[in-house]
Regions:
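Bacterial N-terminal signal peptides
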Residues: 10-20
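Noncatalytic luminal/extracellular "stalk/propeptide" segments of secretory-pathway proteins
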Residues: 29-56, 75, 79-215, 416
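N-terminal capping segment at the start of a domain
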Residues: 48-88, 261, 350, 448-454, ...
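Soluble metallo-hydrolase cores and metallopeptidase-like ectodomains found primarily
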Residues: 56, 140, 146-171, 272-358, ...
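Second-shell loop/turn segments in exported
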Residues: 57-65, 79-90, 127, 145, ...
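Catalytic-core environment of secreted peptidases
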Residues: 67-91, 99-105, 109, 173-175, ...
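Metal-dependent peptidase/peptidase-like ectodomains
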Residues: 134-137, 151-156, 174, 178, ...
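Active-site-adjacent substrate-binding region
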Residues: 218-230, 237, 241-242, 247, ...
């Protein structure tokens, strides 16, 4: 027995000795691979060919296009809840309703997240304006957001004031108190010779694929003049605080692509910026009036005909330190190695107060909710976690998504240069460097819908060249439902920027314009009737496919290099000692203290 045991022991030792080189080789192989394996998967080489699950495409298309519930969500949100101004009771109601609906459809971890203090809560209860003399006329008007109340109906003589620069204020000292002031020049109302409702044609979509070598300077000019206009508005507000008129009437602006007449009023401005902060509060009631009504009073006054106005602005303030909240919910990942990684989608839930915020951005909200419903209905088991974010505070400065990103992923410090501190926070330049959190490496992408009710025609790549061949393959089976276009261009002004700013792939879809810029954007006409059912069904279907693809791939989506705004000044500085024969300019010695 002992001899047999010795033989067995000897054999075992021999096997171990034979195995040692193999084990050592495996160990060396693991060690040599570990630096590569330690990298986030978005840094690894991407496959040339995407694994497309055509069965999943078809299942999502069938559920999204044949069994949609998107319009039911739309009616409940727009008709049942209504306007959703940040800080208002309605936006709180919408936060809670979306949370409960997402939980009811099968999402997990449905909750609200506080993104911080916003400012004053406010509601418009009722507003009406009429001309009492020289004729009776009922006018179209609404209170500017965060306007104080008139505390009952008032009657006053109309006075038009023309203030284009600081010194113009002096002309009206001692004249505005007790009057109803018309503030703003009468703009030209041109014929609407182009359709207010438009879809992209093939030529326009092809034009979108061209990358402009020089950025358009229109917005730069706007920014350059903005500090002057902000300072002027502040001085006008101070003037009205010192010599208070009964109320101020402002004309509705024009639409970006036409429109802004025919009873449509764009109600997204007041007397100053950040008027939801107590320190910037408007000193007197302010309303925005239809351009045709404003024009009649303007012409009468300029013909020296006295005009008497009656009006009542009934508004309610609800506190100076209201907080903003985002609605968050998930479909949990199931792959043990990938479930901690996240694919996000979202839209902003808040709106302006003049209507029910249907196209801006109830449409994006209900499309995002429908995406989650589709995936839950199909009992999709994503490898990565799919997370929805419905943001508030977008209309005032993209606060909700920026707050969420700062809490979870990182943030970019803003410039504190004197000229920058004069601007609203959402317009200040990033100063850097980025401050990132560990979660930033765990999110694959964020997909956003916020361009109205139009169907999806493609996607803005935000200059992410590595993503182009991937998305090109994703949209190939979607061309029959209108998705054809990828553009390297950036687009801005909405929540994907919060993610893009900290190095996370953030995307906004290209959507048909419809009447978004001409009739509904921030207007009193932004109601359920402006929603296009087939377009919303298509948008939810397309986004569900994008989200599913991102959640099921082996790797996270590739990223652009991290932004370094702190290096911008250095990178843009003129080259030194470049010109032959140029003499050095002596540096001025520092003054002695």
């Amino acid at each position: 027995m002992a001899r047999k045991e010795n033989i067995l022991i000897s054999a075992a030792v021999g096997l171990i000795l034979l195995a040692l080189p193999v084990l050592a080789a495996e160990k060396n192989k693991t060690n040599s691979a570990s630096p590569e394996m330690a990298k986030p998967s978005y840094e690894l080489p991407q496959p040339a060919t995407e694994t497309i699950d055509y069965t999943m495409y078809q299942r999502i298309r069938d559920e999204g296009l044949r069994h949609s519930h998107v319009m039911e969500y739309a009616s409940a949100l727009m008709d049942g809840i209504g306007e959703r101004l940040t800080g208002s009771p309605n936006v709180k109601w919408a936060n809670e309703w979306t949370r409960d609906q997402l939980a009811a459809m099968g999402c997990t971890n449905a909750h609200l997240e506080d993104w911080g203090e916003f400012g004053m809560g406010w509601q418009q209860i009722n507003t009406w304006v009429r001309m009492a003399s020289p004729d009776n006329a009922v006018f179209i008007a609404q209170a500017a957001p965060w306007s104080p109340s008139t505390n009952g109906a008032i009657t006053g003589q109309a006075l038009w004031v023309d203030i284009k620069k600081d010194t113009d204020i002096d002309k009206y000292k001692g004249k505005v108190a007790g009057k109803i002031v018309l503030l703003g020049e009468m703009r030209e109302v041109k014929p609407e010779d182009k359709p207010l409702f438009q879809r992209y044609d093939a030529e326009q979509l092809d034009k979108l694929t061209e990358y402009p070598l020089k950025p358009q300077g229109e917005f730069d000019e706007y920014l350059k003049d903005l500090p002057r206009r902000l300072a002027l508005q502040k001085k006008i507000a101070q003037f009205f605080a010192a010599e208070p008129p009964l109320a101020v009437i402002m004309p509705s602006r024009a639409g970006r692509d036409g429109g802004g007449s025919g009873g449509t009023i764009f109600v997204d401005r007041g007397l100053g910026w950040s008027v939801y902060k107590r320190e910037n509060a408007m000193p007197v009631p302010v309303v925005v009036m239809a351009i045709e009504n404003y024009g009649r009073v303007y012409r009468l006054l300029n013909a020296n005909v006295p005009v008497s106005i009656e009006m009542d602005v009934d508004t309610k303030f609800l506190g100076d330190h209201e907080h903003g909240f985002d609605t968050i919910a998930e479909i949990p990942g199931t792959d043990p190695k990938l479930k901690d990684e996240v694919v996000m989608l979202g839209a902003h839930l808040d709106s302006w107060a003049a209507a029910t915020g249907a196209t801006d951005n109830g449409a994006g909200t209900v499309v995002s909710m429908e995406v989650m419903r589709i995936l839950n209905a199909l009992q999709v088991k994503p490898r990565r976690t799919i997370r929805i974010g419905l943001w508030t505070g977008e209309e005032e400065g993209i606060y909700g998504s920026a707050g969420y990103v700062k809490q979870h992923f990182g943030f970019v410090p803003l410039s504190t240069a004197p000229d920058q501190l004069k601007l609203p926070e959402w317009l200040r330049k990033p100063a850097g460097p980025l401050e990132l959190k560990p979660e930033q490496q765990k999110i694959s992408a964020y997909f956003n819908v916020d361009n109205g009710s139009g169907m999806i025609r493609g996607i803005y790549l935000q200059e992410n060249a590595a993503i182009a061949p991937i998305f090109k393959q994703w949209i190939q089976p979607l061309k029959d439902i209108g998705v054809t276009t990828l553009t390297m261009r950036n687009t801005g002004g909405t929540d994907h920027e919060s993610f893009d700013n900290v190095g996370i792939p953030g995307f906004q879809f290209i959507q048909d314009k419809l009447d978004y810029s001409t009739r509904t954007h921030h207007s009193n006409m932004d109601t359920y009737e402006r929603l296009q059912e087939p377009d919303l069904e298509q948008a939810a279907t397309v986004e569900a496919i994008f989200v599913s693809n991102a959640a099921m791939r082996d790797q996270m989506l590739p990223r652009k290099p991290l932004p370094h705004p702190e290096l911008e000044e250095q990178r843009n500085a003129p080259l030194k000692k470049l010109m032959p024969g140029a003499e050095d300019v002596p540096q001025k010695a520092p003054e002695q203290m």
